[in-house]
Amino acid sequence: MTVEKKVLYLGDDDATRAAAYLCGILARYEIDFDRVDGGTSPRDDFQSKDYALYILSDYAVSNFRPGDMEHIVEAVEKRGSGLLMLGGWESYFGRLGEYNDSPIADILPVVLQNKDDRRNDSSPVLLRPTTLDHPIVANLPWETAPGVGGYNQFEPKEGAEVLLEGYRTRISWRNVLAATQSSVQQSDVQIELLEKLPFLVVSTALRGRVAAFASDVAPHWIGGMVDWGTPRIFQELPERLGKDLFVEIGCDYAKFFAQLVRWTGAF
């Protein structure tokens, strides 16, 4: 079976809503892709061909028909396709135990929790690369990366590589009454680091590459990261997804996810 040099992006509602963000990035970087909207099943011919990369983002297990997940696993293990999972209510364990005990869980580079793994933080979760040499995180200004607000919690499997760590923070006034508008100083603000989390985990143990990113690509979980980088990008979506659809996003946000897609799909 031939691997088609193309992405299959499954999940995130449709291109008029959350899916618009990743669709816009793929269009911007001229990465060819097909779509399966959240709440719908793959096409009838799904198991007759392979894609270079399968992206699962907030895509419920119940959408798959018998044999669909096994087809993805076989494509990754034996034929070199890539697999990328992004965070969401219906990713990883999610709200109701989506991918636990599934064939997909066996090849992910992370260990899923056995309970609701969704986390929402009112203070930003700051992302820190463990290396600047990997193609996914290279050539990006991580010192200015905004924090994210939501994510799925998981642990890396043995032998997998953690490329991004997330640091939960608490930001507060030391004395809100003393810090009046006319006398606010940087010393009046307190930032605490609460917890370190694996946030982007990858593996090359199989014939194809696999990656797990804890947060979503779309608001609200991705937080201010959607606006990371100037100049801002205005990107129209392909007309096949709908009429007059577009996104406005930060250039570094777009570059990061494009690099993640290209590495995982070996483009």
Please report, for each region that a protein language model flagged, where it lies by residue.
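Alpha-helical scaffolding within the catalytic cores
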Residues: 38-43, 70, 195-199
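Short alpha-beta junction capping motif
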Residues: 6-12, 50-96, 204-207, 211-213
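Short, solvent-exposed loop/turn elements at domain surfaces
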Residues: 16-19, 93, 171-174, 212, ...
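A short, well-structured beta->alpha microelement
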Residues: 27-47
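An acidic, glycine-rich "communication" segment
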Residues: 85-182, 192
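Short, charged N-terminal beta->alpha structural module
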Residues: 6-30
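Extracellular ligand-binding/catalytic regions of CAZymes and related secreted enzymes
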Residues: 1-7, 76, 182-267
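Soluble non-cytosolic domains of exported or imported proteins
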Residues: 13-17, 62-66, 70, 247-255
